[in-house]
């Protein structure tokens, strides 16, 4: 355990790896050497970091399968990011969470559409009732005998109530 946390040990292993790579590939024109060295360094670091982390996680956690799965997925996602990929590996739990979120949002939108549709139907019914109230009846049904000015055509005896409605009245106000 002391060697895992010892920085000098880790640095000496990295130096040893670099020296070994330099001796294997003595060609100074090797264009891929920095990439190979960085990949090996990342793999070594992941090896040194992941094993103790998994051991501690397994000892402290009660659901070891989920922790191991999460660690492995995290390691692969890190490797994919280092390789330049934008895609990531997701677990079934994350997919189920995303699906639940999508289904919940769809239900919310369906409820909103249902409310809006109900309101629109109510508005259409209200407009229909208003239209029915405002619709004009045909000319054949309207009694137009009282519509024209009867002052010139009827005499006092012919008025329906007995007096001319167009005759001005005298109004006296009390003081």
From Swiss-Prot:
UniProt: Ca(2+) binding residues: 120, 123
Keywords, ordered alphabetically: Activation of host autophagy by virus, Calcium, Enterotoxin, Glycoprotein, Host endoplasmic reticulum, Host membrane, Host-virus interaction, Ion channel, Ion transport, Membrane, Metal-binding, Secreted, Signal-anchor, Toxin, Transmembrane, Transmembrane helix, Transport, Viral ion channel, Virulence
Keyword match Zinc-finger: no
Listed Gene3D superfamilies: 1.20.5.430
Side of membrane Cytoplasmic, spans: 52-175
A GO term for molecular function: channel activity
Keyword Metal-binding: yes
Compartment annotation: Host rough endoplasmic reticulum membrane; Host membrane, Host caveola; Secreted
Disulphide bridges, residue numbers: none
Membrane topology classification: Single-pass type III membrane protein
One Pfam family from the record: Rota_NSP4
Transmembrane segments: 29-51
Gene Ontology cellular component annotations, sorted alphabetically: extracellular region; host caveola; host cell rough endoplasmic reticulum membrane; membrane
Stretches assigned to coiled coil: none
Residues annotated as glycosylated: 8, 18
Lumenal side: 1-28
Processing and modification events after translation: The N-glycosyl content is primarily Man(9)GlcNAc, with a small amount of Man(8)GlcNAc.
Function: Plays an essential role in the virus replication cycle by acting as a viroporin. Creates a pore in the host endoplasmic reticulum and as a consequence releases Ca(2+) in the cytoplasm of infected cell. In turn, high levels of cytoplasmic calcium trigger membrane trafficking and transport of viral ER-associated proteins to viroplasms, sites of viral genome replication and immature particle assembly. The secreted form acts as an enterotoxin that causes phospholipase C-dependent elevation of the intracellular calcium concentration in host intestinal mucosa cells. Increased concentration of intracellular calcium disrupts the cytoskeleton and the tight junctions, raising the paracellular permeability. Potentiates chloride ion secretion through a calcium ion-dependent signaling pathway, inducing age-dependent diarrhea.
Summary of subunit composition and partner proteins: Homotetramer. Interacts with the immature particle in the viroplasm. Interacts with host CAV1, early and late in infection. Interacts with host integrin ITGA1/ITGB1 heterodimer. Interacts with host integrin ITGA2/ITGB1 heterodimer. Interaction with microtubules blocks trafficking to the Golgi apparatus.
Protein family membership: Belongs to the rotavirus NSP4 family.
Domain free text: Binds 1 calcium ion per tetramer.
Protein name per Swiss-Prot or TrEMBL: Non-structural glycoprotein 4
Organism, scientific name: Rotavirus A (isolate RVA/Cat/Japan/FRV64/1989/G3P5B[3])
Upper taxonomic lineage: Viruses, Riboviria, Orthornavirae, Duplornaviricota, Resentoviricetes
């Amino acid at each position: 355990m002391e060697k895992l946390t010892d920085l000098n040990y880790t640095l000496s292993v990295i130096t040893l790896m670099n020296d070994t790579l330099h001796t294997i590939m003595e060609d100074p024109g090797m264009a891929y050497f920095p990439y190979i060295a960085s990949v090996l360094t990342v793999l070594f670091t992941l090896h040194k970091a992941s094993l103790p982390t998994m051991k501690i996680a397994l000892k402290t956690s009660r659901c070891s399968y989920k922790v191991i799965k999460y660690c492995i997925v995290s390691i692969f996602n890190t490797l994919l990011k280092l390789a330049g990929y934008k895609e990531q590996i997701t677990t079934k739990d994350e997919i189920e969470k995303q699906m639940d979120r999508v289904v919940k949002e769809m239900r919310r939108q369906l409820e909103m559409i249902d409310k809006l549709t109900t309101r629109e139907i109510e508005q259409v019914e209200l407009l229909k009732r208003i239209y029915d109230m405002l619709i004009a009846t045909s000319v054949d049904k309207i009694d137009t005998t009282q519509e024209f000015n009867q002052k010139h055509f009827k005499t006092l005896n012919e008025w329906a109530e007995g007096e001319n409605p167009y005759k001005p009245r005298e109004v006296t106000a009390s003081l």
